[in-house]
Amino acid sequence: MSAFTIIIPARYGSSRLPGKPLLDIAGKPMIAHVYDRARESLAKRIYVATDDARIAEAVEGFGGSVLMTRADHPSGTDRLAECADTLELDDDEIVVNVQGDEPMLPAELISQVANNLAANPQAGIATLCERIHDRETLFNPNAVKVVKNEAGMALYFSRAPIPWARDYFADADAGLPPTYDFYRHIGIYAYRVGFLRDYVTWGSCPLEGIESLEQLRAMWRGVPIHVDVAAKAPPAGVDTEADLQRVRAVMAKSS
């Protein structure tokens, strides 16, 4: 297994769930569950990156490590780059970005994405996907789709249904073409530190702006992104109050 560092960006502000990292799930703040999943991955080091003292206090309260960051980062990737500099990581080291609202993320996926990046030295980023089985998901703009080549490198990410089955999709009542597998992107990333340092020097690109997908900035610059099918289906994260109640119910049964 390759050595890697996990950084969990955590913000207190959320338009739909204020204070989301500190919301209680089965007697612990959400961020504690995310940290537990990170520990199960056997990462070399784990940090929560935040600009909020309340989150830092909670993390230190359960024995976690915290990196305090600036509050003006436009994205989680920019926050990771600051952390890499704070930790003085070498350019060839691997950092995995684990979202702070994924309390049930299987640890196997964290290790999978880190190992995939280590095994593909030509890539600057590695990420995961899962097969789409229904037309509703394929046409849902909140589900990001990805197309990859035979070597497992991303060709494009989009909120639109890609690739477009020209003849098949003319029938609005049809399901999915049986001759092609469509994939939904799973938002877990492993980065080479050198890429992170380059990323923050690049301005936003037109594709990133129109799709609102920051990984397109890397593609615009020609950075190869390795995409693998997730070894295990990941449960949905927590974006809404309904998500929170669903996760609470599931974790209450398992505790």
Swiss-Prot record:
Catalysed transformations (reactions): 3-deoxy-alpha-D-manno-oct-2-ulosonate + CTP = CMP-3-deoxy-beta-D-manno-octulosonate + diphosphate
Name of the gene: kdsB
EC number: 2.7.7.38
Function: Activates KDO (a required 8-carbon sugar) for incorporation into bacterial lipopolysaccharide in Gram-negative bacteria.
GO molecular-function terms, A-Z: 3-deoxy-manno-octulosonate cytidylyltransferase activity
Originating species: Hahella chejuensis (strain KCTC 2396)
Xref: Pfam families: CTP_transf_3
Protein name as it appears in the record: 3-deoxy-manno-octulosonate cytidylyltransferase
Cellular location(s): Cytoplasm
Highest taxon listed in the record's lineage: Bacteria
Gene Ontology CC: one annotated term: cytosol
Family under the similarity heading: Belongs to the KdsB family.
